[in-house]
């Protein structure tokens, strides 16, 4: 079976690409050009063409998004429009990846590309539809599920850093049931960046000791399992997902200290029951979903916050922090789409979510003990679980919400979308978030969009309740808030060229920060400060020939220069990509990502980070019956690229050097399609 996906992808005109349907902006099917938001869609063809092995490999192709590697565990942080990663909502099949403590997960490593069918993205606020955390952007990863897998596939990939991946996808029908199965197993040693000096190096200089493990290499290896089963019949679908990371090395602690001890593990189990009947009655379509999720994180033997011999030998085993947390979430949502009024599509719905941080375990040998007093130097590990001094309390949170949205096509080329969502949280109160979008299709080739949206990020359990040696909680916190106004102009001057510009103004307020108030000695989480980011996003696609497509985007961010600026975000970045089907069955892709103008804080004496340019290329061959082969080079020119770290890691975080990957796939049609 010859794979014609990439050939078909390049044969589509740019007008046809703009007519691609998406649901993320209104929860109803709309074309990208008509969607009342700045919407981007990443297809499975994009993933195959670029050789992306993980979701984070392809996200840099979207204007306004920067994926930054964090020094702790080399964890990818997805940032929209100059904001912090905690302003990003990431979902898989509509289920939020957020947890009560750690954002996407303290050991999150992305999502394997082999399970992805498409990715739908909103650049801008999404709380009017999705609720919490959708302040600056929304990503919904749609996986290969029952009814969507049109061929069975096995694949292997091997490459640099001792990286090996195997995957399987299976789709079939049985007695009227559509069945889908995807399995992805991976292991890697990770790249091992050299760390000349770490956080302990500075302490050694102050104390006259020599216990730092630097200079040495940070270890970032890990293993991954991702197993997903889906069964669908008529209007019903059942999905069961299991994700696990194991043998995960964090490399550097949050304080920038080399940590060779930690071998962490996490797991995530999802069970979803979905009902969708678009023809429930003459004027009504009905959706309902029941979702359950269980998450578990453990640091294994613990984080080695300081190496053996720290503090003039008081800690012969080092400063150790063993942590484990587990939480579960149960949610229900029902909505209806009413089309009984001419030119209106009215969606209304309600939902309830219950979250339970049911397990918190922590053992420490430095800090505040279970009696509220500091532990003595050289203390053995002491259990502070179930005390006010653990990293979080075992607590629950419940959320009730209502939402209403109307899409009004009041003329042939004008459309007004108005929506609002009300969320009521059991721990901090309620919040109301509206949206407005006016779309004017001036002609078949020219579209304008004027958008407004309000969004929020709720305070985390750590900010609300956790008593630590570094900060005190505040149960009276309000959510962080944001308001965005943007103007989008999209123009297709010919069938071969598409140009778009997006201008936005993002205002953030009520930031949650740990600060020391006058008259107090402790740092306490409080709502404080405002911040504005203005930006421009430019993108263009040119079908230079039937077998050649060029695309590019350029982003400028102009944030207020105050303490709330996301210091790790570049003020400028650019992306360029070439797809060339230079012979039948042969496809060559090359993509380049430039990151520029990253400044330090005023109290950071290090020189500004250098700009960097990373270029990747992938060659793919699909002409040998059911077989497919690909070869990729990442960081083709072996650029010395670095990402921002805390000042304790003086030379910042070195990104992976040039790396090579080879891939082989075997595809056969499932019986449903023969």
Task: For the regions a language model picked out, list residue spans one by one.
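Extracytoplasmic beta-strand/coil segments of soluble accessory domains associated
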Residues: 21-40, 56, 60-99, 117
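Short acidic/polar hinge/loop motifs at secondary-structure boundaries
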Residues: 96-123
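Periplasmic-side early beta-strands and strand-to-turn transitions of outer-membrane beta-barrels
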Residues: 140, 148-149, 155-157, 169-264, ...
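Conserved C-terminal beta-signal and adjacent last beta-strands/turns
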Residues: 171-173, 221, 225-227, 232, ...
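Flexible loop and strand-edge segments within Gram-negative outer membrane beta-barrel domains
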Residues: 188-192, 218-227, 238-283, 294-326
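Outer-membrane beta-barrel signature, preferentially recognizing the C-terminal barrel domain
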Residues: 260-279, 391-398, 447, 454-508, ...
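Structural signature of Gram-negative outer-membrane beta-barrels, strongest in the C-terminal barrel
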Residues: 327-329, 337-357, 367-370, 374-379, ...
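Gram-negative outer-membrane beta-barrel transporters
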Residues: 409-415, 499-507, 526-601, 665-667
């Amino acid at each position: 079976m010859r794979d014609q996906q990439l050939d078909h992808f390049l044969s589509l005109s740019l007008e046809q690409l703009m007519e691609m349907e998406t649901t993320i902006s209104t929860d109803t099917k709309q074309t990208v050009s008509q969607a009342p938001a700045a919407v981007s869609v990443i297809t499975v063809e994009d993933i195959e063409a670029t050789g992306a092995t993980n979701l984070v490999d392809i996200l840099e192709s979207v204007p306004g998004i920067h994926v930054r590697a964090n020094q702790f565990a080399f964890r990818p942080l997805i940032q929209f429009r100059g904001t912090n990663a905690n302003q990003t909502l990431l979902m898989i099949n509509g289920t939020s990846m957020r947890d009560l403590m750690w954002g996407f997960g303290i050991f999150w490593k992305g999502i394997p590309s082999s399970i992805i069918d498409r990715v739908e993205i909103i650049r801008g606020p999404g709380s009017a539809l999705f609720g919490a955390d959708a302040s600056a952007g929304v990503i919904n990863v749609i996986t290969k599920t029952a009814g969507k897998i049109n061929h069975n596939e096995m694949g292997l990939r091997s490459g640099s850093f001792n990286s090996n991946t195997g995957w399987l996808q299976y789709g079939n029908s049985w007695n009227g049931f559509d069945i889908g199965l995807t399995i992805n197993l991976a292991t890697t040693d990770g790249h091992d960046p050299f760390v000349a000096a770490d956080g302990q190096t500075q302490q050694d200089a102050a104390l006259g000791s020599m216990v730092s493990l630097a200079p040495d290499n940070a270890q970032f290896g890990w293993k991954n399992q991702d197993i997903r089963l889906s069964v669908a019949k008529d209007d019903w679908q059942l999905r069961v997902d299991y994700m696990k990371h194991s043998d995960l090395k964090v490399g550097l602690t949050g304080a920038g200290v080399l940590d060779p001890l930690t071998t962490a593990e996490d797991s995530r189990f999802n069970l979803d029951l979905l009902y969708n009947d678009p023809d429930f009655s003459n004027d009504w379509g009905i959706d309902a979903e029941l979702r359950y999720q269980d998450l578990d994180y453990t640091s294994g033997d613990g984080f080695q916050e300081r190496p053996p011999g720290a503090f003039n030998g008081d800690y012969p085993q080092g400063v150790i922090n063993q942590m484990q947390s587990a939480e579960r979430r149960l949610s229900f949502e029902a909505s209806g789409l009413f089309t009984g009024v001419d030119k209106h599509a009215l969606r209304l719905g309600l939902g309830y979510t219950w979250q339970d941080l049911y397990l918190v375990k922590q053992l420490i040998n430095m800090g505040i003990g279970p009696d509220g007093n500091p532990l003595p130097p050289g203390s053995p590990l002491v259990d502070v679980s179930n005390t006010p001094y653990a990293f979080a309390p075992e607590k629950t949170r419940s959320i009730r919400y209502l939402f209403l949205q109307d899409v009004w096509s009041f003329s042939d080329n004008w459309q007004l979308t108005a929506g609002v969502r009300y969320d009521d949280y059991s721990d901090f109160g309620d919040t109301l978030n509206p949206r407005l979008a006016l779309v004017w299709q001036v002609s078949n080739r020219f579209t304008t969009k004027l958008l407004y949206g309000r969004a929020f990020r709720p305070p985390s359990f750590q900010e609300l309740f956790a008593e630590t040696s570094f900060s005190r909680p505040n149960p009276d916190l309000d959510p962080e808030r944001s308001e965005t106004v943007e103007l989008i102009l999209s123009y297709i001057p010919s069938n071969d060229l598409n140009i778009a510009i997006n201008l936005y103004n993002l205002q953030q307020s009520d930031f949650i920060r740990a600060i020391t108030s006058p008259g107090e000695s402790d740092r306490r989480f409080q709502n404080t400060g405002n911040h504005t980011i203005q930006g421009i996003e430019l993108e263009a696609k040119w079908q230079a020939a039937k077998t050649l497509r060029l695309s590019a985007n350029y982003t400028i961010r102009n944030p207020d220069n105050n303490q709330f600026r996301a210091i790790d975000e570049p003020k400028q970045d650019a992306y360029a990509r070439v797809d060339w089907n230079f012979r039948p069955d042969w496809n060559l892709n090359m993509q380049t990502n430039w990151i520029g103008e990253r400044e330090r804080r005023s109290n950071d004496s290090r020189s500004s980070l250098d700009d960097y340019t990373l270029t990747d290329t992938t060659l793919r061959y699909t002409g040998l019956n059911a077989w497919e082969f690909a070869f990729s080079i990442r960081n083709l020119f072996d650029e010395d690229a670095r990402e921002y770290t805390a000042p304790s890691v003086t030379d910042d975080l070195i990104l992976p050097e040039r790396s090579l990957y080879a891939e082989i796939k075997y595809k056969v049609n499932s019986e449903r399609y023969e």
